[in-house]
Amino acid sequence: MKSLQTLCEISLMRNHSNIQSVSNVPYHLLKRILQKVKIPQLLKLEKSNVLLIFDDDELWLEFLRQDFPTNVHEQFVSKRDIICKYYFDFVKENDIELYHSNQDLLKSCVRQSVVKDIRNNKYRIPYRMLYSKYQQEVEKKQEESAERLRLEMQKLQQEREKKQTIVVDHTVYFKKRNTKKTTRLHNEPHSQLYMKSLKDHESRLKHFKDGGFNIAKRHAQRVAFGGQAGGQSSSPKKGPLSIKPEPVKVNRQMDNVTAEKKDVTQPITPVKKRRSESPSIFLNRKKPALFRPTPKTNAAGSRPHTTAITNDHRTTSHPYPHKDVVTSISSVTANPVTKGHKKKKSGIFVRNAGSDGDSFPHVTATGPTTRPYIYEPRK
């Protein structure tokens, strides 16, 4: 059978969120219950029983590991008074009666909690104090970031206000406006750029004796054609022709209309003269005489009709055994020769050909013309 203490602990653990005060209860009885509570509730229970802060250091170590895992969990100080002052201030703030009545009890509790570490000969900072220190640093960083954000938003708002359009009352603007024409006073100082341009202008006037360029005067002098080039024509201006309206007669119909049209003078248009200059020399160039090779065709194909065989013909043997080919070529060529090109014939095909095969010196007007003839026996 379980003891009464165990049953009470089980009941309190089941309802740990409803615990409001643990005054005058020692820590060893509340250890299992306090392990279930969270930080806000633990702070509230510590205020109801101030002596718990001397014993619940292990609970704050767990909270420190959970909330600040990357931070250092153990820190040391060389002065003991800092830690003692922290404990006494907490007791004085939450239970002032105990602070004044039981000083000996408080000193004994502090003596047991604040112990020098043998390894570095310093005093370890309590985990509750270290947790509050880290928490204050985080809150301070959050406040600084919030302040920076607030300043940035203020700057943006000021820039928007500067660029914002403002509606102006036109009546007030026209009342304040000075209608008199304001002029610059002579004794008022001018800008450096204005003074520099003024000095340059004065030096330019000294350099040119005529006093500088005057746009009203026409300085350009015409030299070509006696000074008349580019100007107006010297011929007298012809005034507009005055046309006297003639009274319209009803009796005349078409004849009067045509006569009136002839009487009306048409506006004089300038006569277009042809350019007297010679055209460019590049336009007189003739097309180059290119040599065009004539296709070599069989004489039999170009002359389908045949002529009679005479004694003047030369007979040649044909490579085919069943056909006797007789060719006769006249001293005058049948194909026309293009202008500028001299066509030569081989001496074996021309009667009385020269040594170089040219037949033109031996051609006569009365000479007989001969053509190639192919003899094909009947089948």
Swiss-Prot record:
The modification Phosphoserine is found at residues 235, 278. Residues 1-143 are annotated as: ELC1-binding. Keywords: Phosphoprotein. Residues 225-248, 260-279, 291-379 are annotated as: Disordered. One of its GO terms (cellular component) is Cul3-RING ubiquitin ligase complex. Coiled coil: none annotated. Present with 815 molecules/cell in log phase SD medium. In contrast to other members of the family it does not integrate a functional E3 ubiquitin complex. Residues 351-379 are annotated as: Interacts with DEF1. Heterodimer with ELC1. Component of a CRL3 E3 ubiquitin ligase complex consisting of the cullin CUL3, the linker protein ELC1, the substrate receptor ELA1, and the RING protein HRT1. Interacts with the large RNA polymerase II subunit RPO21 in a DEF1-dependent manner. Interacts (via C-terminus) with DEF1 (via CUE domain); the interaction is direct. Residues 311-325 have a biased composition (Basic and acidic residues). This is Elongin-A. The keyword Ribonucleoprotein does not apply. PANTHER family: TRANSCRIPTION ELONGATION FACTOR B POLYPEPTIDE 3. Residues 19-63 form the F-box domain. Belongs to the ELA1 family. Residues 295-310, 327-336 have a biased composition (Polar residues). Pfam families: Elongin_A (PF06881). Residues 231-240 have a biased composition (Low complexity). As part of the CRL3 E3 ubiquitin ligase complex; polyubiquitylates monoubiquitylated RNA polymerase II subunit RPO21 to trigger its proteolysis; plays a role in global genomic repair. One of its GO terms (biological process) is transcription elongation by RNA polymerase II.
